[in-house]
């Protein structure tokens, strides 16, 4: 029954209707036979009402030192992370970024990010494979403790997400929220290479290459300055505005010279010279955005007052995405994401029906079959002692 319940949730992400009750509507334009034939609306709502992922009676109270804001869904998310890391071998290039699970209800750790398509919700830090969007590890941001902001939050997040990939020489790409010279040197000690944009006012960023207004006037588009400390290279590239990067992966220059395409005032796009780090940053930074884009196509996340159920939806989305990426690598003829999800729904719901027949159950015992009826001869109708009214 729970498999059919999960199958219905996945199907609702494929065929989207404004309200859940419409899947059982009598209107021929709205009625969904794959859902209504499995179980009644009442049964579906009962399961969803009493659905839990942990024993709430064992949860630590709020005033306890072990209180966990996501206790109800913690073990479920940890299981998904463990399976995602065990069943897939990551490629070299990874990216770190944040994603949002939509939620507008009252919540102590609800966040706002103005540059994201989903501006209000639950923020998660995510480590993804850059080329495929495979979600390898994620961490729910539970807000600051008390009124004090956490020191070195970005550095702590990067270390937490990359702890299991140390000494494997992965290349991590991140934006200027996380990047700082001290962090990159610490990652290099653990055999992790990194590249990313950086804020010019970061501590230890070389002030010699910070572009002033006068320096910008004397530079052409595509010019850049650089300096290095060991394997750590800092770059200041002038596009339409200054762009600052640091990297332990790339040299300051390459042969042939690196370039990126930019829009031109003349009309066609033109090649602009740039540091080698900028080319790979544009290529490999979008792993988390890629996973969000794929999941949003058939998103199963629906409105709910309980935030932990939103995280349940997110975990299910991650499981579907990661399993699909693994399937594409092992299948002889990979199919598209829609057909893959439909196959999952069929597997979870095939041969199952939990609808009860209307009316009261009969109190009369079932009549035993007379074997004489099967001998190919005619027999007179036996009159029973108790007759029913027609």
Where do the protein language model's features map onto the residues?
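Acidic, contiguous segments within the catalytic cores of piggyBac-derived transposases
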Residues: 1-390
């Amino acid at each position: 029954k729970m498999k059919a319940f999960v199958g219905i949730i996945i199907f609702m992400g494929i065929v989207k209707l404004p309200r859940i009750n419409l899947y059982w509507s009598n209107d021929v334009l709205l009625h969904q036979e794959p859902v209504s034939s499995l179980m009644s609306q009442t049964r579906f709502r009962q399961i969803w009402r009493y659905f839990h992922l942990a024993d709430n009676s064992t949860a630590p109270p709020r005033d306890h030192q072990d209180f966990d804001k996501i206790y109800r869904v913690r073990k479920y998310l940890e299981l998904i992370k463990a399976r995602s890391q065990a069943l897939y071998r990551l490629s070299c290039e990874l990216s770190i970024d944040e994603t949002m699970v939509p939620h507008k209800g009252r919540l102590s750790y609800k966040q706002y990010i103005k540059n994201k398509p989903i501006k209000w919700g639950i923020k998660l830090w995510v480590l993804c494979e850059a080329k495929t969007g495979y979600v390898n590890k994620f961490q729910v941001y539970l807000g600051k403790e008390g009124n004090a902001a956490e020191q070195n939050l970005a550095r702590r997040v990067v270390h937490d997400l990359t702890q299991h990939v140390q000494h494997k020489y992965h290349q991590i790409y991140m934006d200027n929220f996380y990047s700082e010279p001290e962090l990159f040197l610490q990652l290099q000690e653990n055999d992790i290479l990194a590249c990313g944009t950086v804020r010019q006012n970061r501590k230890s960023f070389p002030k010699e290459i910070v572009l002033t207004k006068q320096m910008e006037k004397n530079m052409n588009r595509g010019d850049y300055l650089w300096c290095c400390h060991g394997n750590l290279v800092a770059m200041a590239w002038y596009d339409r505005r200054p762009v600052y990067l640091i990297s332990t992966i790339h040299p300051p220059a390459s042969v042939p010279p690196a370039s990126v395409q930019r829009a031109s005032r003349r009309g066609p796009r033109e090649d602009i010279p740039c540091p080698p780090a900028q080319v790979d940053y544009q290529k490999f930074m979008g792993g988390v955005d890629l996973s969000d884009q794929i999941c949003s196509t058939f998103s199963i996340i629906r409105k709910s007052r309980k935030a932990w159920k939103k995280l349940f939806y997110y975990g299910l989305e991650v499981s579907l995405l990661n399993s699909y990426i693994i399937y594409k690598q092992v299948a002889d003829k990979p199919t598209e994401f829609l057909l893959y999800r439909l196959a999952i729904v069929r597997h979870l719901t095939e041969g199952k029906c939990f609808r009860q027949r209307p009316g009261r159950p009969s109190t009369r015992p079932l009549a035993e079959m007379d074997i004489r009826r099967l001998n190919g001869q005619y027999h007179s109708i036996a009159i029973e002692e108790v007759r029913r009214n027609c």
